């Protein structure tokens, strides 16, 4: 799960430290007495070699920012990392008393973390590496399974992607996570990315969120005092959907500005290239909750602009890590299209989509469109499909083309849908997740008052 993948692994450092201590103990035992040393020339040679290696390692300390080295990860295997930042771990002046913020070059940035010196294999230190060559080599070493395992839970998208120059500037500014963990309801969650909280909250090891109003605090005692005063048991706004234990609330950013801003702060901890909007007045937030006798607990949300000239029906989407891989992301996408149907409009997610965002949407479009084509015996046009599904015609065309279900005949696109081919594509698209019970949706489209 995402939260587990994003967690730090202090046991790695402990294990490495224990191994180092055992190694030191063995070397000490080997050189404990003159007689033993004299009777074992190999022991003397090993000690001299070890001493020379230690001197060589010491010359690298403290490691410079940009250094490449192998680091022991939570799988107890060594992985290539790049040192992004460093900090002193004690008041000692020893060059060994540093911690290092590292990026695992095989993995997504969300796994970046602070590690102790014991986790690093100093024999592998590289200080002068051509980044393009190194990154290409790392990419080649990574298997398709590794990439999928790390990235499959991260299909959320931000309000907009960034061009190359903006991306470099963004990564430099956000290179070190400022908040390591949050507590939200009954979950402690490891964060994935930097979020621009007010300066007084930066570098807090942990922030405590009220799961209902999303106010955040530095200390557990503050949260406990707050919870005694907070009257909310669900997100502010109107409950527009209730089916079993699932509820959806529509929150107007203009009416609930602080909640909207706090939601953006929270979301940015788990979305890399999300543009943080302080002007939340322009957005509606649809917050999905699991409900019990204690209240309605947020599991994820999507936002949409109140007025979009491009027919965008979704700007940002997030499922919180503890609730991922349960079908909630697919539910949120489906819900956005049900709102478009109620509006009598076609919709599409805000562009451009990330690769994984496109993969998630392409799966939804495939399932919806092919289910209709399976049941529809006569000819059907792309416009008719769009009217039935609220999916934009361009998205329908690109999806069917990617499945080789479109042919161009006599100046027009023709859908060619063999039942066996449809079944094969549907199987590849996977399950649709939780279904939206449209009969439980009570909602009228947003209209500006006055």
From Swiss-Prot:
Mind telling me which InterPro entries this protein's record contains? Acyl_CoA_acyltransferase, Chromo-like_dom_sf, Chromo/chromo_shadow_dom, HAT_MYST-type, MYST_HAT, Tudor-knot, WH-like_DNA-bd_sf, Zf-MYST
Read off the PROSITE patterns from this record.
MYST_HAT
Annotated MYST-type HAT domain ranges read 174-445
Start and end residues of each Tudor-knot domain: 63-122
Q: Where are the zinc fingers (C2HC MYST-type)?
A: 207-232
The alphabetized UniProt keywords are: Acetylation, Activator, Acyltransferase, Chromatin regulator, Metal-binding, Nucleus, Transcription, Transcription regulation, Transferase, Zinc, Zinc-finger
In which broad location class does this protein mainly occur, judging by the first location in its UniProt entry? nucleus
Query: What job does the chain carry out?
Result: Histone acetyltransferase which may be involved in transcriptional activation.
Report what the protein is called: Putative MYST-like histone acetyltransferase 1
